[in-house]
Amino acid sequence: MTSKKLVNSVAGCADDALAGLVACNPSLQLLQGHRVALRSDLDSLKGRVALLSGGGSGHEPAHAGFIGKGMLTGVIAGAVFTSPAVGSILAAIRAVAQAGTVGTLLIVKNYTGDRLNFGLAREQARAEGIPVEMVVVGDDSAFTVLKKAGRRGLCGTVLIHKVAGALAEAGVGLEEITNRVSVVAKAMGTLGVSLSSCSVPGSRPTFELSADEVELGLGIHGEAGVLRIKMATADEIVAHMLNHMTDSSNVSHVPVQSGSSVVLMVNNLGGLSYLELGIIADAAVRFLEGRGVKIARALVGTFMSALEMPGVSLTLLLVDEPLLKLIDAETTAAAWPNVAKVSVTGRKRSRAAPAEPPEAPDATAAGGATSKQMVRVLERVCTTLLGLEDQLNALDRAAGDGDCGTTHSRAARAIQGWLKESPPPASPAQLLSKLSLLLLEKMGGSSGALYGLFLTAAAQPLKAKTDLAAWSAAMDAGLEAMQKYGKAAPGDRTMLDSLWAAGQELQAWKSPGANLLPVLTKALLENAEAAAEATKNMEAGAGRASYISSARLDQPDPGAVAAAAILRAILEVLQSQGA
């Protein structure tokens, strides 16, 4: 079965992609009759060296994303994973020569088709009297023994674009640029890993992987790698990659050792999430610095992809200060990252958080008995939420993410850990404030924010008094804050529905009289739980569920169910203690 792609046609997808890039970038223009993109200011290059690169499409943003001042002059693109036509390469060489450039350097990845086609175009151009040189980049560190075809050209090619571009912008001649980038190309290596393959438009995936396998040392055309290893943590996979790349017994290794200075590239092969990319980058930095390697610059993003392949490649380039200045040189290329020109290693990566303000004395602080009662209440709430994790997750799946139970369990475990560390504050106001901060930090998601808002606001009326009227006012304040910032109202199918129903029952506490808790408990719980159950017949008016068709929402809202369960746990403990 072929994979789905958002294209107009399989045959025209490479042309359409290049046209889209040029349409949105005024600094680029197409060469009529060819799949070639050039700088739109070619006339400004008179007397300088032109830089041309390219290859098959499907590696975006490479290579056309790196056209610009300080990088490439132009790019010749082939069909997906197919070398560009000789005629188009020659047309690009002629175009930059006619603009008054003093020579052209072809930067070519080491693949047979690219070498042949760029090489043939070079020979034809030279026969016409155009000075043209060619550098073939092979930075693949996958193979431990030398292959006749040499090392494949991978993401390190982009660094060659950058170095050559900086030299050309500085007015360096063709021969010197060729010699210098040839040296640089030998001082780097790249290794890729992927969780699965990719698929050319109109075709099936290029290879199959088991659910517990990853492919190591693969190229950028969907071809299989050199080794399949078992799925592991990001740290373990990164360690495997970097150990392989720097192993001196590997003929294609990068000779990195303690004290070396490197540029690190963490390259998304197309389908990896940026969350995963950040985790990989962190693992790579920690691994290298743990070996005493200085990371002069770290470039993280998508530089050379393989369509939608969910994988990553790591590139290491050994650098000194002169080379680093070329990496840092200004460029207008759209796909080059605008990173700070400072070393990654040795930089302070965190700063102390502001100190919490001292707590004001609380006149409502109660005795030890009340504190123990609060512990029992919180313990029951935690046990209740942990027991509901699977049920709440199941209810939440209708809204898309299915993590309501997990979120509430995370809150419960955070509270349990907090209770083990120290007894809770005796003051109700301070207790609610502390719980608010804890949930905001540990619970996460909109639920954590809403509970945090509720508890922060509810704490305010309890600073002066803790009688029944104050607790009713606290409930009102919490509900008001949730409505103000959460933009929810009763009837919107949220946790507010359960809490609102309970709040209406608590209005009776504002009237003078005896302890009404035993009388209220049954009615309060019945109303709160009925309100939670009623949410299954409501159309969501707030929260993530509001974006889901009401036809799919035929179960109670998980937040409302959780809130009702919390109320039951609280009131049952208080009633059992005779509060």
From Swiss-Prot:
Binding-site list for dihydroxyacetone: 56-59, 109, 114
Entry keyword Glycoprotein: no
Annotated binding of ATP, by residue: 401-404, 446-447, 486, 494-495, 557-559
Keyword entries, A-Z: ATP-binding, Cobalt, FAD, Flavoprotein, Kinase, Lyase, Magnesium, Manganese, Metal-binding, Multifunctional enzyme, Nucleotide-binding, Phosphoprotein, Transferase
UniProt cofactor(s): Mg(2+); Mn(2+); Co(2+)
This protein's GO CC annotations: cytosol
Activity as a function of temperature: Optimum temperature is 60 degrees Celsius.
GO molecular function: ATP binding; FAD-AMP lyase (cyclizing) activity; glycerone kinase activity; metal ion binding; triokinase activity
Catalyses which reaction(s): dihydroxyacetone + ATP = dihydroxyacetone phosphate + ADP + H(+); D-glyceraldehyde + ATP = D-glyceraldehyde 3-phosphate + ADP + H(+); FAD = riboflavin cyclic-4',5'-phosphate + AMP + H(+)
Domain DhaL: 372-572
The EC number(s) this enzyme carries: 2.7.1.28, 2.7.1.29, 4.6.1.15
Noted pH dependence of activity: Optimum pH is 7.
Cofactor note: Manganese or cobalt are requested for FAD-AMP lyase activity.
Transmembrane segments: none
Region (Disordered): 346-368
A Pfam family of this chain: Dak2
Catalytic residues of the enzyme: 221
Gene Ontology terms describing biological process: glycerol catabolic process; negative regulation of MDA-5 signaling pathway
Expression by tissue: Detected in kidney (at protein level).
Domain notes: DhaK and DhaL domains have differential roles, individually DhaK is inactive and DhaL displays cyclase but not kinase activity.
Family recorded in the similarity comment: Belongs to the dihydroxyacetone kinase (DAK) family.
Main function: Catalyzes both the phosphorylation of dihydroxyacetone and of glyceraldehyde, and the splitting of ribonucleoside diphosphate-X compounds among which FAD is the best substrate. Represses IFIH1-mediated cellular antiviral response.
Protein's name in the database: Triokinase/FMN cyclase
Organism name: Sus scrofa (Pig)
